[in-house]
């Protein structure tokens, strides 16, 4: 083989290698761009899917439920209806990410989810870590107890003296139990479904909840009732309101606030009434 032919073949081989590298790079860039586009086209919302009537898990898409990411189950409830309105306004596909309560803030901060719509109150402590929108629901604290039980006719906090009371871990609901004189404050529980089981079995005498959850519990179980206190818990307005949690500096915050402000109080109550009626245990 001549020297010139050898040089020609080496040059051609080098050109082929460079062309292949260029194609690979372009494909990688293309795949990356596609992935980024997909991320921008969805709104990943974190919630427990276990806090009816705000959010729950069900087996089908009835009543507007949305499929849970990575699951054959669906999420429904008041929070899901709010999330659907927000996603529509942002022009994004709603993706529900089922997340334990204590995992919601870490999931938001680590970009696993884009928003928390989970009946979360915008407390000052949480606001140090994440941003909150305008409130999308406001309620009050009540105590769920056994119908016909020792505390069913209670009128004041003092009437619950000696009662075994609990609520959810890392919530204001649990903190306000300290306002009950001589209460037996039980260990906080992970979810309200656990509290319902504990109340039914007599492990506790009651638990502190927001009024919608109390209505939900008593609607689902005729053995439960709830007490609205004449002289109730002393709370900050932020403790009984719920808002959407966002990462600090989220560019969509103003747009989301517009969506929330457009929902009238009457509409909010209608959505909550529908959620209470549609919760799986109420059927």
Residue ranges and their predicted role:
Residues 78, 96-108, 152, 187-197, ...:
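Short helix-initiation/N-cap motifs at beta->coil->alpha
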Residues 22-41:
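Short, low-complexity, disordered segments immediately C-terminal to signal peptides
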Residues 120-128, 176-179, 201, 205-238:
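A ligand-binding cleft/hinge motif common to bilobed small-molecule-binding domains
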Residues 22, 80-89, 162, 171, ...:
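Extended ligand-binding regions for polar small-molecule ligands
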Residues 93-159, 235:
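Acidic, polar ligand-binding/catalytic clefts
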Residues 17-20:
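C-terminal motif of bacterial Sec signal peptides marking the signal peptidase cleavage site
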Residues 37-120:
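Extracytoplasmic small-molecule ligand-binding "clamshell" domains
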Residues 138-147, 219-260, 278-283:
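Periplasmic-binding protein-like
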